[in-house]
């Protein structure tokens, strides 16, 4: 009963309402720092996904842990050989600390212990088990020419992942899964098809195990790192188009309309935020929504990267993100 009361109270705070129904004088949540998080090992945190960990009662962030500070790595070897880092927050998402890396078991045909791990997405099934959809490159390479796969893994504790299975999709060169539960049942995955001019494709599943590819979802502009979520009566897709984030809106999660302009294309003023924003995640928390993204703060072509957060705003038709405004973060446990 106490736990339920706390969740309801947090929901009221997140929507900016007091218990009396009157508008609260201040937006709830602690102010997030800039940067929100830097990886203390390799200083290359990117591609965040934020999920509630009910086992520890804290929010966890999974991220690609690029080897930004490792000397002697030629060409793009530094973005290969990566593991998935984990950070956690005990204040509803405003401050984060490093936890370690995810224990991910991959078979030898997918690179085994030498595989490159990128851009996870994590969802929780109705039975309580967690499912990760991970981009896997079977080795460490100096170029972009090699196969990439989206691999499904499962876990009971969010730390240890096994039962790896490649998801059969349109081509053997795919990255960046975004998976959501559909209102009528089943699941939908969006991903980047690198062989089709880096268009965004999608696939459907009844059980998170067997997937049917449905073809191209959007293809007006090349992009990667799609994130799909439902908020304020619409479906939204945010993609990394390397000039900020492209935004699409849909009534049915099938037919998408592009929003003019890009989010986070103009550099911010905060520390490590004076660069375009890339590869996002979005957490919907009550009536509010928070976009997590990464930057290369030292400029284009540099390696170091940091995680940032901004609160989204919308009238139901257009998404907005004021990255220089103080982000008071309050993520409701889910």
Predicted features, each with a name:
Residues 1-2:
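N-terminal secretory signal peptides that target proteins for export/translocation
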Residues 5-14:
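Bacterial N-terminal signal peptides
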Residues 19-334:
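Carbohydrate-active catalytic/glycan-binding domains of CAZyme proteins
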